[in-house]
Amino acid sequence: MVKEDERADGHLTAASSERPAYLDPQAPVGERIADLLGRMSMEEKVGQIMQLDAQNDLRSDILDKHVGSILHTSPKRLAEAAVLVRQTRLRIPLIVGEDCIHGYSFWPGATIFPSQLTMAGSWDPELIERSARVTAVEASATGVHWTFSPVLCIARDLRWGRVDETFGEDPFLIGEFASAMVRGYQGDGLDDPTAILACAKHFAGYSETQGGRDASEADISHRKLRSWFLPPFERVAREGCRTFMLGYQTTDGVPITLNEWLLNDVLRGEWGYEGMLITDWDNVGRMVWEQHIQPDYEHAAAAAVRAGNDLVMSTPGFFAGALAAIRDGLIQERDLDGPVSRVLRLKFELGLFENPRVPDAARIAAEIGAPDHTALNLEIARRSLVLLRNDGALPLMSAESAVPNAVKRIAVVGPLADDENNQLGDWAGGSGQVNWIDEEPTGTIVTVLQGLREEVPDGWNVSYAKGADILRLVPDPAGAAFADGQPRPPVQQACEPDPALLDEAVRASRQADATLAVVGDVIALTGEGRSTATLELFGAQNELLEKLCQESRATGKPLIVVLMAGKPLILPQCVHEVASAIIWAGNPGMQGGRALAELLLGKIEPKGRLPISFARHAGQQPTYYNQIRGQHGNRYADLTQEPAFVFGEGLSYSSVEYGPCTLSVVPGDGNDGDGALAGATAARGEESSQVPVAAVEDTIRIRVQLTNTGTRPASETVQVYIHDKITSVSWADKELKGYARVELEPGETRMAVVDIPVAWCSLVDTRERRVVEPGEFEALVGHSSKDQDLQALSFVVH
């Protein structure tokens, strides 16, 4: 058999009987890495730990800078990159990365799911895992090996532009959903050709901003990080997420890119993480041109290598800077061997040296937007919609509906009711991060208007009036480009009310039996670098809602309001006073309009629950439920502290009654203690008669009886929060530690069971240790995080 070898100039030949060890798929990965490292030049090592934007000079990046990875790669550039790699000396394959945040973002016709925040409304890790599996299957078919997802940031300041990318405000739920997404992406192992690398981001504390401003200083202590922000990352690190992305921000004056405590002491030390660390976009350059903590790219490159970064994203100046740093003795060439080895290990484990996984035309045709992927997308959209208010107007086809039983006429009003790309939200075809796709292909998205028209019975009439414009874009007065040459996006300017549009909307409402108003935000108002100072509806949307509320008051006809937005926005007071129903749709993805139509008509049941709280006013923040106890009073002088809608909230079309609750202890030896150990029992509103005692190695088991007292099927999400009554340090009043989703037919009674390891009932003490303190606890069981929705079961930890 003809084998490849290396010429004097390093190029592979087919003349020798021996092939290099790094090309032997039977050799251990460690041996292959060592062999290849020994063959690489200093320049090739520097390039190997660089990832550059494939929208730029791809030929120079691969042939001159020897880059190890590329991102934002168009279909045309993917094929070009494969050809260029074969022209390199060692033919080291590229890792191709892409921002597949909630679906395969930038391939025409690929599946775009609801946003992370919207999917979190399903409270269903299994569905989220399946969405990630679909994304991996589609992306891998096109030659993508890596997604920069999931996002594990905690959304606490709703002004922050990237709230939509998170799973919400609760660390426990974030860990549940992020873990599921990692499993979906990475599949059964990296040798599976449909697997792609997952990337946990943004490590860590990135969302703890100043004033909600993206990438601003995160004023956060080590103890606070350990308490709330690190646990989801620790979970996915220990479960095998192969890459981590480092946030833009500084913490305590040190950029995360250089934070040796986080990167080396915690991540690689305490957690034993062996995966690859990548900077976020131009983190190394930002130390020079934005944060001004390094004098030039030479010093910035040296600092990044010393701190333990493995791959430098989109800093072209790193190449010359790192070479200069080696030449001047700031770092040694051997300092590159660790990061280069970690990059190469992933390439070997992915099997890229044997199969570089270039675009596969047959798989692309079979997988991109496949019917089963669309069906899953619809199911996730259905499960994610959250019904927040309903006075009986919904469902529209119910005999009990407030809409007259004559011929149905529905007025669909609002600027987002028939807006395909803004329905998808950020990180999708029209969101502007890449230059080869302006919007998703027509026909792949079902808007609310389209969905209703397709789903209503024969004889119904669905009219449409836009009613308002949201914004217009104008050039940024600060200039056309940032300091690094990246173009500044245009700035948004709110549109004024248009009397003609308002009159058209009022006429449509007056002529209908019910009005559906679809309002929210647009891509220009959400995402990276797009934080907002307020949470109000932009443009003329508030004026539109005022007019529609006036009409509803005058006619008595139902007004249904749908909030389609990347983050929790504030609805005007008139909506809270007048609207018959309110639905949070988030960014519901390609099938969102159909799912919403089915919900409105009663073809499906509402099942979603809020993963995040809604403020009444931007100045009311923070509104997240798990705040530290201990303040004067429980309201502002001018406003309640109670959010408009709370974490965990969500209605069904039926009613579910909570019956008696019990708490028992399952011993740590695994034997079921039900019936064998004393347990706490409480009926609604009653105190428990016994207090179980548990050890740290035990599990508490909560059972609650649920009865569907309505005439329609119901889906109830039983939530269990832990309240540690006396703590050695200030701590949250309650934390979600478990939940169960229960389906109930009309009149059915079922028992829900939630198990919570006592070890989860922990806090972080003053020495930054996570511990379970002995003492009295309560398990708070109920429908949402509202105190009035919860019943308490006491237990003691010894």
Predicted features along the sequence, with ranges:
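Intrinsically disordered, low-complexity regions enriched in glycine and serine
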Residues: 669-678
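Glycoside hydrolase catalytic-domain context in secreted enzymes
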Residues: 1-669, 684-687, 692-765, 773-787, ...
